[in-house]
């Protein structure tokens, strides 16, 4: 249980830090862009972690960290906000590239370590 608590807290702090840095240093950056990068990189890291066995506690710590780092709920909120603002094409593109990008990110991470 402690691994889950620590991992989730670390992941949430990392997500906050990446989002803040993205907004501060990115050219015309939007939070949506930071969420996209966070989710794709988180999937790639998860693929890397799961490609080969790790000690149980370490694996649980990393999976919990990535659960706190990635943010499916914010992704959904942003996609629905685009849809609500009648930016339907942008919403669909965001949905597709996020889902496909996350799948390919996971495969990339898996293949790097496998």
Curated annotation (Swiss-Prot):
It is a multi-pass membrane protein. Keywords: Cell membrane, Ion channel, Ion transport, Membrane, Metal-binding, Sodium, Transmembrane, Transmembrane helix, Transport. The lineage of its organism: Bacteria, Bacillati, Bacillota, Bacilli, Bacillales. It comes from Shouchella clausii (strain KSM-K16). Disulfide bonds: none annotated. InterPro entries: FluC. The chain crosses the membrane at residues 3-23, 31-51, 57-77, 92-112. This is Fluoride-specific ion channel FluC 2. Fluoride-specific ion channel. Important for reducing fluoride concentration in the cell, thus reducing its toxicity. It holds the Pfam family CRCB. The keyword Nucleotidyltransferase does not apply. Na(+) binds at residues 67, 70. One of its GO terms (molecular function) is fluoride channel activity.
């Amino acid at each position: 249980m402690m691994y889950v608590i620590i991992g989730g807290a670390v992941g949430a702090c990392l997500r906050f830090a990446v989002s803040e840095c993205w907004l501060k240093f990115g050219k015309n950056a939007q939070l949506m862009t930071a969420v996209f990068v966070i989710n794709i990189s988180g999937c790639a890291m998860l693929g890397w972690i799961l490609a080969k066995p790790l000690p149980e506690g370490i694996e649980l710590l990393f999976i919990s960290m990535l659960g706190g780092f990635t943010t499916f709920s914010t992704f959904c909120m942003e996609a629905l906000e685009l849809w609500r603002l009648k930016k339907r094409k942008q919403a669909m593109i965001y949905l597709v590239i996020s889902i496909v990008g996350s799948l390919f990110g996971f495969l990339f991470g898996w293949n790097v370590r496998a």
